[in-house]
Each structure stands twice: as structure tokens, then as C-alpha cells.
């Protein structure tokens, strides 16, 4: 049985004061241990957040890493640097990175390779736009994004997939549990074609307006192994409720 994973993507939010209050409401959640929990703050807060969660069962993740190694790349943060900051995870391929910063499948595959080489576990985000879904291409587009990274990972690498339909991110809209399950099953079957030995072990998360009111129903689906949570991860009570829903 796959252990549920709940990852909080803070995006470009937070302050030292707000982060402290948020984490104080999460670190003692009773469900920690029964569920794997990751928080992914903005780069400037990695060190302070790591200090705040170091004695808890919460793991630290980065929201991104560079496709390059260390060197003359002004403004870039390498995977090695993230690992040096005690990150265990890194979010890659998020739709906001694809849309706002023109990251294509080739760039994302390179980032995945850098991440695993540095000992980070990628949370690979894939998902279709509303136009893709309405044209009947949702599965085609999503599986193509997954296909792009198979050359960057090995069966024994640690990584997870997060299905995030772009039309559901930050909109309040959520894919139905049945729609999520259908796509998660397709993703798992695609993994089976490349790495049959890990297809039933790898975790596939759902992301896209996940909140306490819909989490339990989503988690009841056989191929939904947790969530990548955006806005709701910024409210401790809401995030803890989602974590608890993953246990039930």
C-alpha cells in the first residue's frame, strides 16, 4: 500500500512572521507519521523553515531548481544548492513555470536530471489546459509531459508525479474524483510501460484547488496517493485537515 504524501506549495507567499505562525500550527499535527508531509517555501525562507521543522516529521522541499549546475548563471539556484539547504524534494514542471517562464518539456527533463543527481526527489507536475480538455486531448497532452522525463530518471530514483489540471489551479474548480482517478490510472499505466517494476509503487498526487472539503473524496480513489496543495497550504487549520483526510 502506498503511503499518502501531502506537499504544500507556498508559491510566492510568506514572511518570516507569517511562516512561523503557519508552521506552529502544523508541526504537531497528530497525523504526521501516518502521512508524509512536505512544505515548499520560497527560496529565501528555506533555511528558517528548515530550522522550524527540523525536529518534526515534516520534510523540506524547493519550488524549483536550475537546469544548470553551479556557475555563471545569475539568479539561478542549482539543485545542489537546494540539497545543501537540506531540501529532500523539489517541485518541477509546475504549470505556472511552463506558462509564465516558457519552460518546455526539454528544460523540465534537464531539471529532473539535475535534481536526482543531487539527491532530490522531484515532484513532477503534469496536466492539461481547459482547451486541451475541451478538444479531447487531455490524456494525450498529460502523458506527453510525463514521457519527456523518462530518460532523466532510473527505476530506483525517488520521484513522484503530480497531476494538476491547469484549469483547476487557483480557480476553485476541481476535477471530479472520477476524472482524477481516470487520469491517474492512465499515468500509472504509462509508467508501467517504461518502468513496470515501480508502476504500482510510485505515488501520483492530485493538485488543483485541493481543500479540506474535497480532499477525503479525492483520496478515496485507488490511484490518488496524496495532494500537491497550493492556497490551502497557507492556512494551518486547512492544511492539517487535508493531512488528516489522507489518514482516514
UniProtKB/Swiss-Prot annotation:
Main location: cytoplasm
Record's catalysed reaction(s): D-glyceraldehyde 3-phosphate = dihydroxyacetone phosphate
GO biological process: gluconeogenesis; glyceraldehyde-3-phosphate biosynthetic process; glycerol catabolic process; glycolytic process
Keyword field contains DNA damage: no
Listed Pfam families: TIM
Protein's cellular compartments: Cytoplasm
SUPFAM superfamilies: Triosephosphate isomerase (TIM)
One cellular component (GO) term of this entry: cytosol
Residues annotated as binding substrate: 9-11, 170, 209, 230-231
InterPro entries: Aldolase_TIM, TIM_sf, TrioseP_Isoase_bac/euk, Triosephosphate_isomerase, Triosephosphate_isomerase_AS
Pathway: Carbohydrate biosynthesis; gluconeogenesis; Carbohydrate degradation; glycolysis; D-glyceraldehyde 3-phosphate from glycerone phosphate: step 1/1
Active-site residues, Swiss-Prot/TrEMBL: 94 (electrophile), 164 (proton acceptor)
Keywords: Cytoplasm, Gluconeogenesis, Glycolysis, Isomerase
EC number: 5.3.1.1
Superkingdom as given in the UniProt entry: Bacteria
A molecular-function term among this protein's GO annotations: triose-phosphate isomerase activity
PANTHER family linked: TRIOSEPHOSPHATE ISOMERASE
Role, per record: Involved in the gluconeogenesis. Catalyzes stereospecifically the conversion of dihydroxyacetone phosphate (DHAP) to D-glyceraldehyde-3-phosphate (G3P).
Record NCBIfam families: tim
Family of this protein: Belongs to the triosephosphate isomerase family.
Complexes and interactors: Homodimer.
Protein name listed in UniProt: Triosephosphate isomerase
Native species: Hahella chejuensis (strain KCTC 2396)
UniProt gene name: tpiA
Amino acid at each position: 500500500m502506498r503511503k499518502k504524501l501531502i506537499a504544500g506549495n507556498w508559491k510566492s507567499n510568506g514572511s518570516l512572521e507569517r511562516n512561523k505562525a503557519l508552521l506552529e500550527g502544523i508541526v504537531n499535527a497528530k497525523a504526521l507519521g501516518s502521512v508524509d508531509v512536505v512544505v515548499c517555501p520560497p527560496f529565501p525562507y528555506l533555511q528558517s523553515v528548515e530550522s522550524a521543522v527540523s525536529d518534526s516529521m515534516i520534510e523540506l522541499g524547493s519550488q524549483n531548481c536550475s537546469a544548470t549546475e553551479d556557475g555563471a548563471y545569475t539568479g539561478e539556484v542549482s539543485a545542489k544548492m537546494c540539497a545543501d539547504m537540506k531540501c529532500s524534494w523539489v517541485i518541477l514542471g509546475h504549470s505556472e513555470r511552463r506558462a509564465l517562464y516558457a519552460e518546455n518539456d526539454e528544460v523540465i527533463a534537464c531539471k529532473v536530471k539535475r535534481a536526482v543527481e543531487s539527491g532530490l526527489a522531484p515532484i513532477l507536475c503534469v496536466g492539461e489546459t481547459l482547451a486541451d480538455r475541451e478538444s479531447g486531448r487531455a490524456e494525450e497532452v498529460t502523458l506527453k509531459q510525463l514521457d519527456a522525463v523518462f530518460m532523466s530518471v532510473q527505476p530506483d530514483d525517488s520521484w513522484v508525479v503530480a497531476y494538476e489540471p491547469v484549469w483547476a489551479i487557483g480557480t476553485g474548480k476541481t476535477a471530479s474524483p472520477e476524472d482524477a482517478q481516470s487520469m491517474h490510472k492512465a499515468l500509472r499505466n504509462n509508467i508501467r510501460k517504461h518502468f513496470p517494476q515501480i508502476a504500482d509503487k510510485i505515488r501520483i498526487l492530485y493538485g488543483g484547488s485541493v481543500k479540506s472539503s474535497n480532499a477525503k473524496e479525492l483520496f478515496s480513489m485507488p490511484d490518488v496517493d496524496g495532494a500537491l496543495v497550493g492556497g490551502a497550504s497557507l492556512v494551518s487549520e486547512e492544511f492539517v485537515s487535508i493531512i488528516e483526510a489522507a489518514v482516514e
